Amino acid sequence: MTKTLVIYVHPVEESFTSCVRDAVIDFLTTQHHEVRLRDLYAENFDPFLSAAERALHHTPPTTRPELARDVEDLRWCEAIVFVYPTWWSGLPAMLKGWIDRTWMNEVAWVLPAGANTIRPRLTNIRRLIAVTTHGSSKFVNALQGEPGKRTISRSIRVMCNKFCRARWIALYGIDNSTLEQREKHLATIGQRVARALR
């Protein structure tokens, strides 16, 4: 079974996104995957990248001991499932801040001496799955270019195993969705995550 890190991002526990999180966790545990859940809001993760921390950009991760758990999780997992709402066409600031702070030098990538391109370090990660919601329609999101999807499927993926696959599981138009549509979406999440993990 797959070592799976679930990164959950939503400030309101009663949100539909929390139902999505529960559906993902239920599926993964039922299928006997090893799961670590990180609830960034509940943990009060600080997404703020300070000037002092940015000055440490090319130093080892040990210079930021407050991120040791994040580093260990990233090095442990074989798959990451991001569960979050899409806001303003992209990743919530909390998630973007987590990426900015934890996908760091000597963790996600390294720039060897004399080289002009970075090399990926998270080669243990073979699957990236985003499970998200959009307030607007799929058509509107296509017009906007889906920057959140691009961040995960392009920018993040290249720091992983060269055979890493990224999958996008989205419910579009949630602002005008019916209870039936939301329940149908929740009922299919397990199957869709299963396909993505193959």
Language model segments and positions:
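Short hydrophobic segments within beta-strands
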Residues: 7-9, 38, 83, 131
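N-terminal beta1-alpha1 ligand-phosphate binding loop
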Residues: 2-33
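A short beta-strand-loop structural module common to alpha/beta enzyme folds
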Residues: 33-44, 167-172
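Glycine-rich, highly charged phosphate/nucleotide-binding loops
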Residues: 55-75, 185-192
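Glycine-rich phosphate/pyrophosphate-binding loop and the adjoining helix
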Residues: 140-143, 147-198
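Helix-loop-strand module that forms the ligand-binding subsite of alpha/beta enzymes
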Residues: 62-144, 148
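N-terminal beta-loop-helix "entrance" segment that forms/cooperates
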Residues: 40-61, 178-181
